[in-house]
Swiss-Prot record:
Matching PANTHER family: TRANSLATION INITIATION FACTOR IF-1, CHLOROPLASTIC
Signal peptide per UniProt: none
Entry-linked Pfam families: eIF-1a
Organism phylogeny: Bacteria, Pseudomonadati, Pseudomonadota, Gammaproteobacteria, Chromatiales
Alphabetical list of SUPFAM superfamilies matching this protein: Nucleic acid-binding proteins
SMART domains: S1
Primary localization class, coarse: cytoplasm
Domain named S1-like: residues: 1-72
Provenance organism: Nitrosococcus oceani (strain ATCC 19707 / BCRC 17464 / JCM 30415 / NCIMB 11848 / C-107)
Domain of life of the native organism: Bacteria
Any one GO molecular function term: translation initiation factor activity
Family: Belongs to the IF-1 family.
Descriptive protein name: Translation initiation factor IF-1
This protein's encoding gene: infA
Chain's role: One of the essential components for the initiation of protein synthesis. Stabilizes the binding of IF-2 and IF-3 on the 30S subunit to which N-formylmethionyl-tRNA(fMet) subsequently binds. Helps modulate mRNA selection, yielding the 30S pre-initiation complex (PIC). Upon addition of the 50S ribosomal subunit IF-1, IF-2 and IF-3 are released leaving the mature 70S translation initiation complex.
CDD domains xrefs: S1_IF1
Length: 72
């Protein structure tokens, strides 16, 4: 899938799940399940509850996403 096909949205981490999965509430109110991208995992970027994050969603399944950025 090409990078242009993904949808990027802002959200807040609501809950931490096992296996580096997180429950993220998007700005529009939807709650999705998201995992950390490989580069964030490689650079040991920690994500805590309450962090503002940028999430990439695919048009095929809007209930799952990938966390690509954590706001400072």
């Amino acid at each position: 899938m090409a990078k242009e096909d993904s949808i990027e949205m802002e959200g807040t981490v609501v809950d931490t799940l096992p296996n580096t999965m997180f429950r993220v509430e998007l700005e529009n109110g939807h709650v999705i399940t998201a995992h950390i991208s490989g580069k964030m995992r490689k650079h040991y970027i920690r994500i805590l509850t309450g962090d503002k994050v940028t999430v990439q969603l695919t048009p095929y399944d809007l209930s799952k996403g990938r966390i690509v950025y954590r706001a400072r």
